[in-house]
Amino acid sequence: MEFKQPNRPSYCTWELNATNSPHTCRTKNGDYTKIMPDILTAIGQTPLIKLNNIPKSYGIKCEIYAKCEFLNPGGSVKDRIAYRMIQDAEDKGLLKPGCTIIEPTSGNTGIGLAMAAAVRGYKCIIVMPEKMSDEKISTLYALGAKIIRTPTEASWHSPEAHISVAQKLQKEIPNSIILDQYTNPGNPLAHYDQTAIEIWKQCEGKIDYLVAGAGTGGTISGIGRKLKELSPNIKIIAVDPKGSILDPSSDSQNEVGFYEVEGIGYDFIPTVLDRNVIDKWIKTEDNESLNAARMLIRQEGLLCGGSSGAALIAALKIAKDIPEEKRMVIILPDGIRNYLTKFVSEYWMETRGFLQPVCQNEMNKWWWNMKISNLSFDKQSLLKENTVTCQEAMHMLKNADSQLLVISDDNIHIKGVISLNKLTSYVISGIVKCTDFVDKAMVKQYVKVKHSATLGYISRVLEKEPYVIILDDEHDDAFIGIVNQFHILQFITKNGTSNNYLIN
């Protein structure tokens, strides 16, 4: 099967200040004061809200306004492009009654497409990496979409990645179509025709800076192009998370890695991203971005998502040098609904080191301040990469006390974990074959805890996590073992009297 590149050269002929646009224009005509024919008509016309408390606390003099895209009916900025791509496909005769829409996505485009598919009567299959939140999955299921998960660690062009899996499905399913947000001109055009115009009118033509996260690049490219046409002096600021390569700086190309913030950043350059329209790139990190999102919620009452925090952090970094008479607009792409079990949860933030743990021994438990080294647990054997097949791994897991296998490339440091549930799911869904090496089903994101941590801290982490990986902080984070709630319970019941255990 020929792989369709999501980063192939763009054929767009748009030029700044051209007399005529080469594209079909779709303006927004919905009237919110009247009855609407369906929910899709309600997409767009999101409010522009002034930030007050946060700029004041940071000593920012310029005005900062937030475009609240999370107030779209599907909960994100991606509602706009989903509807636009469907409209364009229908007009071209590519999407007809009975068709199935397939889309590789980080979730929000999928939700927008599933919502539109529900209204229009199409079937919908969404292919998304496992990193994405359970809340997005639940929303997609509620809208009637089918969902296929792919390994987060898979590189964008690998057969296991969401793009390849979607293309494979499209070949197998009759009357199916991939609208392909990475290359579809309707992605940036939705923002060129509507979002940018809304911002311009809301600001009454007075806007000096636009700050937005870059994912597929459609949002910032479409808005940026239109605003540059309307006012050439506007500065377009793009936000790229550390671990992504969208920022064209030389360092960024060697920084490909995992990051928690969803919906922005990629390990390839999507076709629809026009980096020429961007004046400055700001790199952001998970810690600052997710805490900034919590700050937007707590201090401004804006129920936004994690990538909104990245936009805020980028804005604050440049706003400190911007004079009082200037005006900045930031895009808040999605909302809190998608992340209730992620950055909204203090447990989740603590276990990833983004918040200082709150470990108070309120019940005066005798074991609370004891070290992990007091626990009795077996160190799992470390398996070499590319030595065990999925079939062999399933057999090993079924016959072992542990439900986990540990992969290492040097027999000292852990590279990833294999769980029976995950491996079985991958085999059943066809993501991996029984004859594949088990590394393809390896999980690289897990909670790591230092050997010097207390049992109280571990017990708090294990309230939400099924297990934690213990590393030796005195010996270059060498793998020590895996601890779950059973190990702590076993220690308590073995070393404390039954009365003491019950009372404390």
UniProtKB/Swiss-Prot annotation:
Family, per entry: Belongs to the cysteine synthase/cystathionine beta-synthase family.
Catalytic activity, EC: 4.2.1.22
Modified residue annotations for N6-(pyridoxal phosphate)lysine: 78
Positions with a binding annotation for pyridoxal 5'-phosphate: 108, 215-219, 307
Cofactor: pyridoxal 5'-phosphate
Record's protein name: Cystathionine beta-synthase
Activity control, per UniProt: Has no response to S-adenosyl-methionine/AdoMet, unlike mammalian orthologs. Binds non-covalently to a heme group that may control the redox sensitivity of the enzyme.
Binding site for heme: 12, 23
Cystine connections: none
GO biological process: cysteine biosynthetic process from serine; cysteine biosynthetic process via cystathionine
Reactions catalysed according to its record: L-homocysteine + L-serine = L,L-cystathionine + H2O
Function: Hydro-lyase catalyzing the first step of the transsulfuration pathway, where the hydroxyl group of L-serine is displaced by L-homocysteine in a beta-replacement reaction to form L-cystathionine, the precursor of L-cysteine.
PANTHER family reported in the protein's UniProt record: CYSTATHIONINE BETA-SYNTHASE (PTHR10314)
GO molecular function: cystathionine beta-synthase activity; heme binding; metal ion binding; pyridoxal phosphate binding
Biological classification of the source: Eukaryota, Metazoa, Ecdysozoa, Arthropoda, Hexapoda
Associated pathway: Amino-acid biosynthesis; L-cysteine biosynthesis; L-cysteine from L-homocysteine and L-serine: step 1/2
One cellular component term from this protein's GO annotations in UniProt: cytoplasm
